A protein has these predicted regions:
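Hydrophobic alpha-helical segments
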Residues: 1-158
Length: 158
């Protein structure tokens, strides 16, 4: 049995969540995060949470933001791949720390290193992006939002 879509059954709450997401996206951009950097956070958190809808959406948006397919394919092994810049690695570490609770000693160390690299404003903005995608992952998972088939260019297959 399919559960109700939270976004459809509570449209005012969905509108508020969407407004929060838009505000955080604006804040992230003003703090110096690139669209690719925010997509790294969204894709990695969605992988960890097992959210198919958000993975489908944000993988396409990541490619549109310039992230290579190779880097997307290797995200589960990013720490060993040696392909990612220091900033990209910081985004991925933030995504993992914000998604895997409670914070471990390793996660706390990763966050401290990311903060040192990014500075407080960009670091906090990245954390907000991670918090927000975790919210949307849970909405989509609980709503059982479907993933629709797409062709190689990302267009819906009829």
């Amino acid at each position: 049995m399919t559960r109700p879509y939270l976004d459809k059954t509570s449209p005012d709450v969905w509108k508020a969540a969407s407004a929060l997401s838009a505000s955080i996206a604006d804040h992230a951009a003003s703090a110096g995060l690139t669209p690719a950097e925010t997509e790294y956070i969204k894709v990695r958190a969605s992988q960890l949470n097992g959210c198919p809808f958000c993975l489908d959406l944000h993988s396409r948006e990541a490619r549109a933001a310039g992230i290579t397919q190779q880097k997307l394919d290797l995200l589960p092994a990013w720490r060993d791949a040696e392909l990612y810049t220091d900033r990209e690695a910081a985004m991925l570490a933030i995504a993992e720390a914000a998604t895997r609770m409670p914070l471990s000693e390793n996660s706390a160390a990763d966050l401290a290193a990311a903060r040192g690299l990014l500075g407080d404003e960009a670091f906090a903005a990245a954390e907000w992006v991670a918090v927000t995608i975790n919210l949307f992952n849970r909405i989509s998972i609980l709503s059982e939002h479907p993933v629709r088939p797409r062709d190689a260019e990302g267009k819906l297959v009829k």
